[in-house]
């Protein structure tokens, strides 16, 4: 049986927040494809990107890209305010993505959402963590450690015990030291997958 579809990364959808997200625009596009008789939407990888922001150069095969979290939904959920979101510049040219502005603005807003939502969503976040602990524990520690070591590649991190040996004692020490950033990573993954599954 023959079928047709389209290839379009979610970031290519229109958005006032720098890149397309898992929000209303994605739902409307999926509805449009259905009405147009299309059976497939190839979305390309959705993992968190690093330097260069290519969806094919990701830090994890399992994690979702925080850029794709819909800020409008976070306003609806009471985790952000309209004023906070509107105060952030995601770049001056709507035809091009300014990844520097996107990174700075988006992560500041997501940190605010985490501060407000961690206790409110704690039971759901804990359940999400338990279901995904096989990859999420390591990924959250990695992202927090990368930030701790100035966003340098892991092979340049000063602590050889963390880079090479990764004993449970060393991991626990860093989990305690970097608890706030680890919590932020876990919360953003929770938000991403909640929105992804809703789509």
Identify the residue ranges that each predicted region occupies.
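Acidic/aromatic-lined carbohydrate-recognition and catalytic surfaces
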Residues: 1-199
